[in-house]
Amino acid sequence: MSRYRGPRFKKIRRLGALPGLTNKKPRAGSDLRNQSRSGKKSQYRIRLEEKQKLRFHYGLTERQLLKYVRIARKAKGSTGQVLLQLLEMRLDNILFRLGMASTIPAARQLVNHRHILVNGRIVDIPSYRCKPRDIITAKDEQKSKALIQISLDSSPHEELPNHLTLHPFQYKGLVNQIIDSKWVGLKINELLVVEYYSRQT
């Protein structure tokens, strides 16, 4: 299944706010109207919608998400929390959380077009897994800095998660540590996602 490129508002109307996908928010009450039209949700549908939320927020294909679930299962600790850590430490998501890109698709474009350096080297893989002490900067070109400045200017200036530090005038972000689960940028029940895949495989 390919990455979603359709109307974004349609997705947030059904699944709720997905800040990684779009800055738009569903109108108040639209979720309640959808629920009343569709009646009581089955357990399968509840798990499916949580999985879809995760997939669309982080901009993943079905195959990519399944791969992350399998990696998380093999790691020590809670599978759900490890899964969220893996997704949050992706380079495209780190750029989004720093405010250097307005959405995760915008961050992916910055990376694909080689505007971003990690530890002084160009990285053009959006799924690159950032590590503590990584230094993320804009390429030293006017176009790269201008693109990031637009995002920084329009950023809502929310409190940065404690695993990141931003130096906006230097177009630089630092990864201080692996993200703590309480700073994850999406309201989600990750256990339902794990359950969804455990029943599929």
From Swiss-Prot:
Region (Disordered): 20-44
Localization (cell): Plastid, Chloroplast
Keywords annotated in UniProt: Chloroplast, Plastid, Ribonucleoprotein, Ribosomal protein, RNA-binding, rRNA-binding
Residues covered by the S4 RNA-binding domain: 89-150
Pfam families linked to this entry: Ribosomal_S4, S4
GO cellular component, one term: chloroplast
GO aspect biological process, one term: translation
Subunit structure: Part of the 30S ribosomal subunit. Contacts protein S5. The interaction surface between S4 and S5 is involved in control of translational fidelity.
Function: One of the primary rRNA binding proteins, it binds directly to 16S rRNA where it nucleates assembly of the body of the 30S subunit.
Name this protein carries in UniProt: Small ribosomal subunit protein uS4c
Gene behind this protein: rps4
